């Protein structure tokens, strides 16, 4: 007497067998000690780049510069109120990459709303809150350029980047 298995029953049996075999592989290492990994602090060699003088900035008037290299457009903005990550006499100067984290379109600063807006897919970012993504297609915050302020000569410089600039595997090429 021949026993025929339907296609549906065959798939049920094969799927169950694969699940049991997979569970055995996963649980086989459950009691093993985790491998020790030496995670040292790595610092990317960001350049120190002069951006401008604090007194030369006007509130809500972006100043363009490139950082960390010539193919990375950025803007510095005097927000007019103390801002997280801000530098200067009033801690109100921030800088961000202007490449949208969704598809790399250049964002523009809207002074009336105090936001960066992407014209391609309508993402909106908040420079008052570390470039946080407010709405739109982007899933990451706008990269913030880390600034340093020298009160003696009223200059601020770019010293690093928080976040990944669009289209890169590393901010330093």
UniProtKB/Swiss-Prot annotation:
Induction: Induced in the presence of arsenite. It comes from the Bacteria. Pfam families: Rieske. Predicted to be exported by the Tat system. The position of the signal peptide cleavage has not been experimentally proven. Heterodimer consisting of a large and a small subunit. Involved in the detoxification of arsenic. Oxidizes As(III)O3(3-) (arsenite) to the somewhat less toxic As(V)O4(3-) (arsenate). This is Arsenite oxidase subunit AioB. It comes from Herminiimonas arsenicoxydans. The lineage of its organism: Bacteria, Pseudomonadati, Pseudomonadota, Betaproteobacteria, Burkholderiales.
């Amino acid at each position: 007497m021949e026993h025929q298995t339907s296609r549906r029953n065959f798939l049920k049996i094969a799927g169950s067998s694969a699940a049991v075999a997979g569970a055995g592989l996963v649980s086989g290492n459950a009691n093993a000690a985790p491998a020790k990994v030496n995670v040292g602090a790595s610092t990317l060699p960001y350049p120190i780049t002069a951006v401008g003088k604090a007194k030369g900035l006007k509130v809500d008037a972006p100043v363009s510069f490139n950082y960390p290299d010539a193919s990375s457009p950025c803007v510095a903005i005097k927000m007019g109120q103390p801002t997280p990550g801000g530098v200067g006499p009033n801690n109100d100067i921030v800088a961000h990459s202007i490449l949208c984290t969704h598809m790399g379109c250049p964002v523009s600063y809207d002074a009336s709303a105090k936001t960066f807006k992407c014209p391609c897919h309508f993402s909106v970012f908040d420079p008052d809150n570390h470039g946080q993504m407010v709405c739109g297609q982007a899933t990451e915050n706008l990269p913030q350029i880390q600034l340093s302020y020298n009160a003696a000569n009223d200059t601020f410089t770019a010293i690093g980047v928080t976040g990944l600039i669009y289209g890169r595997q590393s901010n330093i090429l």
